[in-house]
UniProtKB/Swiss-Prot annotation:
Organism of derivation: Borreliella burgdorferi (strain ATCC 35210 / DSM 4680 / CIP 102532 / B31) (Borrelia burgdorferi)
Signal peptide span: 1-17
Subcellular location as annotated: Cell outer membrane
Protein keywords: Cell outer membrane, Lipoprotein, Membrane, Palmitate, Plasmid, Signal
Signal in keyword set: yes
Cellular component GO terms held in the UniProt record: cell outer membrane
Biological role stated in the UniProt entry: An outer membrane protein that may participate in pathogenesis. Some human Lyme disease patients have antibodies against this protein. The Mlp proteins probably undergo intragenic recombination, generating new alleles.
Membrane topology: Lipid-anchor
Matching InterPro entries: Mlp
Protein name per its UniProtKB record: Lipoprotein MlpI
Lipidation (N-palmitoyl cysteine): 18
Residues with lipidation of kind S-diacylglycerol cysteine: 18
Amino acid sequence: MKIINILFCLFLLMLNSCNSNDTNTSQTKSRQKRDLTQKEATQEKPKSKEDLLREKLSEDQKTHLDWLKTALTGAGEFDKFLGYDEDKIKGALNHIKSELDKCTGDNSEQQKSTFKEVVKGALGGGIDSFATSASSTCQAQQ
């Protein structure tokens, strides 16, 4: 009888130890899932320079940034423009807006197209002298 009691106690101990391992395993699995979820949350895609700039621009400036993007078609020209100081970019976009506002009338599309080429050439020399070197001929032709 003593042997049966001892064997029974050993059986219960073994059974109890198996259950405790299952609990640890499930806790470990849930911990791993939680860690994976946290890693996914922290691995957001970084924003591009253009997206970061767009957050700081007004609607008019965003419109003229799109216009400028179509003007700067060369390899890396637009990226180079995005590398300039934010205040200089805003100043350039405001200058573009004021010059394009002057282009009205019958041949305004041609004037805007010509101004696009002027802007492209003016930005080739940098943004510092952009406002003085990029002028449209719109008002002079009216």
